[in-house]
Amino acid sequence: MKHFEANFDGLVGPTHNYAGLSFGNVASLNNAALVSNPKAAAKQGLQKAKALADLGMIQGMLAPQERPDLNTLRRIGFSGSDAQVLQQAAKTAPALLNACCSASSMWTANAATVSPSADTRDGKLHFTPANLVDKLHRSIEPTTTGRILTATFNDPHYFHHHNHLPEHNSFGDEGAANHTRLCQEYGHAGVELFVYGQEATNPNAPRPQKYPARQTLEASMAIARLHQLEEDNCVFIQQNPDVIDQGVFHNDVIAVGNQNVLFYHEQAFLNTQAKLDEIRRKLDTELFFIEVPTTKVAINNAVKSYLFNTQIITLPSGEMAIIAPTDCQENPAVYAYLNELLTLNTPIKQVLYFDVKQSMQNGGGPACLRLRVAMNEREVAAANQHTLLNDALFARLNTWVDKHYRDRLSTQDLADPQLVVESRTALDELTQIMKLGSVYPFQR
């Protein structure tokens, strides 16, 4: 049977804006209050996804969340018509309105953690939506995320969906952005790397001082239990607290893995050597640990360019390629390193550059925009076929974006009642295009 790694990218929602909501994410804070272009953002994301499909990859799309989130605004005491709720929130609590209008679900690396059937005791593909408790604007996503995932991977014979973890900082979970999987072939049992920022229940353990550690060891271990993983299939590794304090808010900003390659910055982890030895012990295959030294790429350049927030994909030819943002080309140190990387004797043979600037300005590169799902051909056939990107769906989604999305949106525009109407009309049509059923609160 054939095995693949599919990528499911987040469709950028109609309210994509720059409100600077993500403390600890330098790009997000630096670009707060810029005027955004939701139409361009959605098209950039679709273009990147289609390019991967054209390379022969299995590429899916995940629907965005309903925003503005009037349910949450009502839950915290705003009342009246939709227009009145928006007006009151804009006047008395603009920061809360901004949080309820975020299009952050576009970064599906935070949607969930996924364990493929080759690793799990029951032989099913497991999904757990991330609770994202560290950030208000993302903590309101998981229930709808769970519905969208269930509608996308909709055959219970193959797919096992869990509820998100308890909504408490002890179980802070940021999904696949802090998780990667190493293996020989996608269909073989692999080793899942769970990267955490702190131990919530151990006050003496190392933790960052300036910015929050969004992922806890307790959350990572809970996911491993839920997903029925054996100890031999897991390695728990702590992210270096010093790099979190330099703006590395998720592990996918400082490391990325694919099959038998782990590409990471020398400052990425604590106890690096011991953990690499553990991976070698648990995964009996030839491994390539590509460590990028600080002397070649400083942390600030890695964060600015999102060198590690790239995708490493295995092309149908068997060669690996890096999918990088054009920002990597524009940073001399990073561009020089990537050119050097291609001369080293590793499976990575090419670098392909994509413009995802609308996402980058909010602090998310190519890897943030996708959820990786290792699947066999039966599982691919059992998934919702209307979510898999081909020429027809690509054309249809582009037409849908042209019809419903604005080409400029400022934070002041978020209080416009018309935005609610536009957003709901768009999402209602999208659920019909992608055959998702009633996943949104306004449809229920």
From Swiss-Prot:
Which residues of this protein are catalytic? Answer: E174, H250, C368 (nucleophile)
Pathway the protein contributes to: Amino-acid degradation; L-arginine degradation via AST pathway; L-glutamate and succinate from L-arginine: step 2/5
Instruction: Please list the residues that bind substrate.
Output: 19-28, 110, 137-138, 214, 252, 362
Identify the keywords attached in UniProt to this record, alphabetized: Arginine metabolism, Hydrolase
Source taxon at top rank: Bacteria
One GO MF annotation is: N-succinylarginine dihydrolase activity
Oligomer status and interactors: Homodimer.
Q: By what name is this protein known?
A: N-succinylarginine dihydrolase
- State the organism of origin: Shewanella sp. (strain ANA-3)
The root-end lineage is: Bacteria, Pseudomonadati, Pseudomonadota, Gammaproteobacteria, Alteromonadales
